[in-house]
Amino acid sequence: MSAEIKKTGVKKVVLAYSGGLDTSAIIPWLKETYDDCEIVAFCADVGQGEAELEGLHEKAIASGASECYIVDLKEELVADYIYPTIATGAIYEGTYLLGTSMARPIIAKAQVEVARKVGADAVCHGCTGKGNDQVRFEGCFAALAPDLKVIAPWREWEMVSREDLLDYLAERNIETTASATKIYSRDANAWHISHEGGELEDPWNEPTKGVWTMTVAPEDAPDKPEYVTIDIEQGKITKVNGELLSPYAALMVLNEIAGAHGVGRIDITENRLVGMKSRGCYETPGGTVMFAALRAIEELVLDKSSREWREQVGAQMAHLVYDGRWFTPLCESLLGASQPLANLVNGEVVIKLYKGQAQAVQKRSPNSLYSEEFATFGEDDVYNQKDAEGFIRLYSLASRIRALNSKS
């Protein structure tokens, strides 16, 4: 690149930086590609773990960044993005609890805030041209800062493999802990961790034990079940085993407890936003328990029509979050519309954890519509079974008329 004419028009860029191979190569690439351009690294702490953050500032500076901002977003992620999303019942394609998708808007928002703080005229990400994340990040940038230029090196540079990136860094004497033998592509945050690539790209290959990092194998989990009590107020988890906890703290406690019982593993082939299918193995131990607890209370407090409507909202919300459309009027509308039902979701649930399963075995709510008197098969004074006759006749009226018309 040094022999080529450098691009102009970008004086300061904020890079979403992880310290991994891709973003380590992006810093020198930006300096070589853009004339007199200052690189500011930005890292979002979304609960990926201390090991991922250790030495990150020093590594960014050594790679050529002028500064590295590490922003703690853990509490905000869980309280303002995860909790509202799961309150709608959002599950992508029936199984995926949207771990990566929910984290992208808050990361993009914080990146824009850093860009404004330092006076940058561009933002940069390390997403590949085949994945969903490029759309998610750039969709958020468009909504929050349409004036900022977006740089996506994977759609520009000529490097196509890990080996290319390693050679690029070696030529510039930039140290990296990455190797050409890396097996899996992983993305972690407080809610989950995803595993892709390697032998997982063949859907005929069963994931080995080495794939999973947050959960034990269900067959190796304790032979004795563990019971966890969860308190819920207005669709939000407030207590775990009687202890009042912040959203992030509650998730961390449940991650540890549920992970020890092998809870929260899924292996799916999903439809990506960009049109192709991809296989992903996901671990969401605490989130799986939270979801089970919320659904248990919903079963008690939501009438049939409300529950059907909530499922419709959840399905639409899942696609919206997966597709990276958080900062839109539709997202605001869905979250606002789901809140009246979430306000009814109050109660206490006991979840049984055993060999990879999380089952609600006890539940109660002050808003419960369930009545043992009405539901009993014994004699009662509150329900006259003869009343059902007229209801059934009216309920089946259309079928009756259709049958009579067909005979005539």
Swiss-Prot record:
It catalyses: L-citrulline + L-aspartate + ATP = 2-(N(omega)-L-arginino)succinate + AMP + diphosphate + H(+). L-citrulline binds at Y96, S101, N132, R136, S185, S194, E270, Y282. Disulfide bonds: none annotated. It holds the Pfam family Arginosuc_synth. CDD domains: ASS. It is found in: Cytoplasm. Keywords: Amino-acid biosynthesis, Arginine biosynthesis, ATP-binding, Cytoplasm, Ligase, Nucleotide-binding. SUPFAM superfamilies: Adenine nucleotide alpha hydrolases-like, Argininosuccinate synthetase, C-terminal domain. GO terms for biological process: argininosuccinate metabolic process; L-arginine biosynthetic process; urea cycle. PROSITE patterns: ARGININOSUCCIN_SYN_1, ARGININOSUCCIN_SYN_2. One of its GO terms (cellular component) is cytoplasm. Its EC number is 6.3.4.5. It comes from the Bacteria. L-aspartate binds at T128, N132, D133. ATP binds at A16, Y17, S18, G19, G20, L21, D22, T23, S24, A44, G126. InterPro entries: Arginosuc_syn_C, Arginosuc_syn_N, Arginosuc_synth, Arginosuc_synth_CS, Arginosuc_synth_type_1_subfam, AS_cat/multimer_dom_body, Rossmann-like_a/b/a_fold. This is Argininosuccinate synthase. It comes from Shewanella woodyi (strain ATCC 51908 / MS32). The gene is argG.
